[in-house]
Swiss-Prot record:
Belongs to the ETT1 family. GO terms for cellular component: nucleus. InterPro entries: Nro1/ETT1. Residues 246-261 have a biased composition (Acidic residues). It comes from the Eukaryota. Residues 1-18 have a biased composition (Basic residues). This is Enhancer of translation termination 1. Keywords: Nucleus, Transcription, Transcription regulation, Translation regulation. Disulfide bonds: none annotated. The keyword Nucleus applies. It comes from Debaryomyces hansenii (strain ATCC 36239 / CBS 767 / BCRC 21394 / JCM 1990 / NBRC 0083 / IGC 2968) (Yeast). It holds the Pfam family Nro1. Required for correct translation termination and probably involved in regulation of hypoxic gene expression. GO terms for biological process: positive regulation of SREBP signaling pathway; regulation of translation.
Amino acid sequence: MAPKRHLGLGKAAKSKKQKKDDSSEVENPVQQSNELTVELNEEVDANDEVSQLRALWKTHAKSDKDNELVVNGIIHECDRLLRNSNLAENEDGEDKNKASTNEDGPKELPADFHSIYALALADLALFHSTDVNKVKEFFDAALERVDLGLQSHTGSIELLFTKSRILINQIPLQYISQLTVESKVQDGVPKIDEKLDAALKIYEEAENQAKALKQYELFNEDNLEILQAFDDLLEIVDNFGKDNSEGDESDKEDDGDYEEEIQLSKKHPLYGIRNTDKYNEWWRDHTIQFLQNVDQQLEKLGISYKQENETENALLPLRREICKRIGQSYLQEAEIPSTVFTTLKYDEGFADVDQLEGLTRDESQKISQYLFKTALDYLKMAEDKEEPESWVNIAESMISLGNLYELDSEEQENYYTEAEKILTKANNATNGKYEDILENLQT
């Protein structure tokens, strides 16, 4: 059987954005169809059109991204700025003085302009996901825009990050969406792992250049979304075929070939991703590297993540989120060895079995203990003093770790006792939300 993915988080770790009230979006359909207004903060120059574009893009990026009108508005604004820039360049050859006083738009557009333009074009594909031709058209245009930007800004790290993001997002929307379990690599159907390798290579190029030039500020919330998109992609690959098999549970039970139906042949376009752990390992290695680069920013600012500040730097919640994702990835990796240990140790039906999943009882115990301890280290760094759920994540990991020791041993009791203290605190802070977990621990 194909190995299961243990490291990635996918949508389970992705923070869910709350939907806004739809009523506010339809109050004035005339204005909505013809205007886009963005509230600029005090730092944005109202006379700087590129700054206004950045503000519009930032508003979109932090939203649910479900408004095609906004995306089209961004693209139209990019078109206008590009036309003005090209006009200024043409005028420069005829009248340099005239070009220098042209106020319609900047003469040379910055790298992030091309990044915004390309990402907006790629986002349009989300609104036309059922039309493969349009999806291809939007991604082709997005990648062309990035490449044009790289011609103007050779080696731009920001544009390299953008290109890797677009290439990763392209894979599920343009390629995986057209596949079935029976699909094979042939004319017009590429190996998806080769597409993914190309995207990850570009990400690594951007990552290495940013580190070499000490541009650690590029390791921010926006670029963390690249790793999240990659993680979501791995989850899609893991679950590929299951959606088509969903239905009457009785049918599944009667169908002895059910598991075989969702296995992929070696000729399947997704086989090269599903049947290896290298992509899961890549995700975690580069997420840890991302964390280290965030720490470089904090060190430069003289800020310790352990320090409690009245006004918290924006990098600190970002750091906690990264630590949470890494910690949860170790928890997921621990699932199989910990299950092997408890089965071999406590299940009488396996009394004569020496190994499961290639692991003995002692091996599975040691591996599980290491993984849970590592997860616990990261989850402690992810703790938010204002968020009880983060405390509970720590407590539950302590309970799982305690379960891997001998019954009533000192190690087990220590983990259980500490977990109970944390759960009691969280339960009191949430008016009894964690009462069931606490009671199970105490019985």
